[in-house]
Amino acid sequence: VPSGIRATIRAALRAESETHQLRSQLEQQLPQLQLKLLLPESEPVAALMAFITGYVESVPSCLRLVTAVSKRLGFFDYAAPFLHLAEDYFLQPPDVLPPNGGLAGLLDKAFLAHRLLEEVNDHHIKHLQQPLLPLDMTEANIIVHHLLGDAFATRLEQLVGFTAAQLLHREHVWEQVRALPGTREAAIPVVSSEHLTEPAQKIRLRLAS
């Protein structure tokens, strides 16, 4: 994982600690967010900030994990374009992203990276019947979808879907991967994205009645 990603994350967290820009936005959005998310009654904005920090900081670890697993199972050449693209979301963001900096801008990029990895993970399950990542980011990604706002998040989803479709056509690679001994190893236990936050500060989706 390029050191530039970690440096970008550190800089954004440092800027947020000085400006509180994202915290102020969340305070304004709180009434709308509470319609979609189950937040702790005590300090809900602090819980959201902890969740966002964990979500953003988990990107380098996820990229590193996909790199290691794909190399071990012999399909790194297949995964590499996705990994490079996820890195580029941080280092060379696409034009669809607004030029806002700080932690708010980084959340946009982290959402793109995590959603792209989710697409790769789904494809891995389809072909090998086990997940690539030991962390299920599905719920976390839906939560961030709500934090970004439906209209903007949907545009980012469409970008990821279009990009993934361009890269997921090389099905012949999976025939080779399925024949590798490593693909028959016991699957790594999958933990849910709620582990991104402290147990006392869980953010959950509010299910429609």
What are these regions (language model features)?
Residues 81, 85-113:
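Membrane-inserting effector segments that mediate pore formation, membrane fusion
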Residues 1-82, 118, 122-209:
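Terminal, membrane-proximal amphipathic helices
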